[in-house]
Amino acid sequence: VESGAIDCIWGCFSMDGREEVYRWAGPYMVSRQVAAVDADSSIRALSDLAGKTVAVQSTGKPEEIFLTGSDPRIPQSVEVLSIENRSVQYAMLACGYVDGIAAHETGILQYMKDNAVDFRILEEPLLVTGLGIAFAKNDTRGLDSQLTDTLAQMRADGTLERIIGRYLENASQYLEVDTIGA
């Protein structure tokens, strides 16, 4: 994006920790990064992951959260497997190769729906953040502002909820961007 090869980065791109790196349109949607386990697992809370193995997608927020050790809710004894392809982490949990996974809640829900598997998402999220569209810091075209305005209009007139509702149940909960950090 900085080189101008692409205009923006758009696709489940969380703003958290990147606010000063890019110009942002949004947030347009709430993202919950969560941990999930097999439905029959005895793991009920993040603290129960002590001594367990968790698969995460490489370069994603869950990987950062688990590997930096900066979140006191995450036991230091968790073994983290960083996987390049996120669909592999879901299969690893379904096959019992790992004790848990950490990813976007929406991705986990969609995988469960598409593959008829039963994971249990832990109640306490790893991170609640806004998804946005990132533009280069030196981009002066104003596309970030225009897109922010357009997304706000789409949210106000129900267009975003209708679009998200085609893919996710309870679409309105993903549009509560005003509650992020509250």
Each predicted region: which residue ranges?
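Acidic, polar ligand-binding/catalytic clefts
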Residues: V1-D48, R120, P125
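Beta->alpha turn/N-cap motifs
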Residues: G4-D16, A39, Q57-K61, R86, ...
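A ligand-binding cleft/hinge motif common to bilobed small-molecule-binding domains
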Residues: C12-V21, I65-T68, M92-A94, V98-L127
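Ligand-binding cleft/hinge of the Venus flytrap
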Residues: A25, P62-I83, Y90, M112-A116
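Periplasmic-binding protein-like
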Residues: M29-V37, K113-A152, N170-A182
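Extended ligand-binding regions for polar small-molecule ligands
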Residues: D40-I43, S47-K61, I133-S172
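Short helix-initiation/N-cap motifs at beta->coil->alpha
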Residues: S41, V80-A91, C95, L127-T129
